[in-house]
Amino acid sequence: MRIGHGYDVHRLVAGRKLIVGGVDIPHELGLLGHSDADVLLHAISDAILGALALGDIGKHFPDTDPRYKGADSRALLRHVMELATRKGFHLGNLDATIVAQRPKMAPHIPLMREHIAADLMADPDRVNVKATTTEELGFAGRGEGIAAYAVVLMEEK
């Protein structure tokens, strides 16, 4: 078994959709990035890649490559999971935390878990997503961005 940790952060800006955990969340601001900027799925992808010593999301999907402009992060996560499967691993469990002052993430977490479990070919009871604020401290607390942390346990088949 192997453990991986992932972290990602994206700036909130006008004129972009807010997509977190594969869910389109109504909000006046969205996350800025080369792809759809799904901060949670990027952190999860990095955690899986790290557990398997396969580098990071930037190595596999560089922001200099036009193929990934506006890319669906769910498709990227599925590709990462295919790499894990080819190496003989499946998800043991995932624990992830979204750090956002607003909008509130709690109403969207059940659908996020459903999407993530499907993309990782795992039972939903192996996928945990939670959200917290920073009590209005720092960039997240000021509403300038959203961060996410993820820890995965990958098990050999």
Swiss-Prot record:
Keywords: Isoprene biosynthesis, Lyase, Metal-binding. Its EC number is 4.6.1.12. GO terms for molecular function: 2-C-methyl-D-erythritol 2,4-cyclodiphosphate synthase activity; metal ion binding. The record marks 34, 133 as: Transition state stabilizer. Binds 1 divalent metal cation per subunit. A divalent metal cation binds at residues 8, 10, 42. It comes from the Bacteria. Its cofactor is a divalent metal cation. It catalyses: 4-CDP-2-C-methyl-D-erythritol 2-phosphate = 2-C-methyl-D-erythritol 2,4-cyclic diphosphate + CMP. 4-CDP-2-C-methyl-D-erythritol 2-phosphate binds at residues 8-10, 34-35, 56-58, 61-65, 100-106, 132-135, 139, 142. Pathway: Isoprenoid biosynthesis; isopentenyl diphosphate biosynthesis via DXP pathway; isopentenyl diphosphate from 1-deoxy-D-xylulose 5-phosphate: step 4/6. GO terms for biological process: isopentenyl diphosphate biosynthetic process, methylerythritol 4-phosphate pathway; terpenoid biosynthetic process. Involved in the biosynthesis of isopentenyl diphosphate (IPP) and dimethylallyl diphosphate (DMAPP), two major building blocks of isoprenoid compounds. Catalyzes the conversion of 4-diphosphocytidyl-2-C-methyl-D-erythritol 2-phosphate (CDP-ME2P) to 2-C-methyl-D-erythritol 2,4-cyclodiphosphate (ME-CPP) with a corresponding release of cytidine 5-monophosphate (CMP). Belongs to the IspF family. HAMAP family: IspF. Homotrimer. This is 2-C-methyl-D-erythritol 2,4-cyclodiphosphate synthase. It comes from Geobacter sulfurreducens (strain ATCC 51573 / DSM 12127 / PCA).
